[in-house]
Amino acid sequence: MNGQGASADPQLQQFIEIESQKQRFQQLVHHMTEVCWDKCMDKPGPKLDSRAEMCFVNCVERFIDTSQFILNRLEQTQRSKGSFSETMTD
């Protein structure tokens, strides 16, 4: 090796970050599927009835809404911490 290691390769770092994001997304989808399945499926049959279908739609939409709310809240918190620390250093 050249002594710099893998941390010096920006392309490798970007690839690892993208793969990590893919993995987190897959975990989120798996979790959402599991939660909504347990909530909406009473008895699996040959096809989805309209009640179960509507339950899945609502479950996924609430999951997305909640995730978006949490992300927005975290972003606001980070911004307020950043502006607070900037005023402290001025």
Curated annotation (Swiss-Prot):
Compartment(s) where it occurs, according to its Swiss-Prot or TrEMBL record: Mitochondrion inner membrane
Q: Which GO terms describe its molecular function?
A: metal ion binding
Q: List the disulfide bonds.
A: C36-C59, C40-C55
Q: Where is this motif: Twin CX3C motif?
A: 36-59
Record GO cellular component, one term: mitochondrial inner membrane
Question: Which InterPro entries does this entry report, sorted A to Z?
Answer: Tim10-like, Tim10-like_dom_sf
GO terms, biological process: protein transport
Q: Membrane topology per the record?
A: Peripheral membrane protein
Alphabetic keyword roster:
Chaperone, Disulfide bond, Membrane, Metal-binding, Mitochondrion, Mitochondrion inner membrane, Protein transport, Translocation, Transport, Zinc
- Top-level taxon: Eukaryota
Its domain description in UniProt is: The twin CX3C motif contains 4 conserved Cys residues that form 2 disulfide bonds in the mitochondrial intermembrane space. However, during the transit of TIMM8A from cytoplasm into mitochondrion, the Cys residues probably coordinate zinc, thereby preventing folding and allowing its transfer across mitochondrial outer membrane.
> What job does the chain carry out?
Mitochondrial intermembrane chaperone that participates in the import and insertion of some multi-pass transmembrane proteins into the mitochondrial inner membrane. Also required for the transfer of beta-barrel precursors from the TOM complex to the sorting and assembly machinery (SAM complex) of the outer membrane. Acts as a chaperone-like protein that protects the hydrophobic precursors from aggregation and guide them through the mitochondrial intermembrane space.
Q: Which family does it belong to?
A: Belongs to the small Tim family.
Tell me how this protein assembles.
Heterohexamer; composed of 3 copies of TIMM8A and 3 copies of TIMM13, named soluble 70 kDa complex. Associates with the TIM22 complex, whose core is composed of TIMM22.
For this entry, the protein name equals Mitochondrial import inner membrane translocase subunit Tim8 A
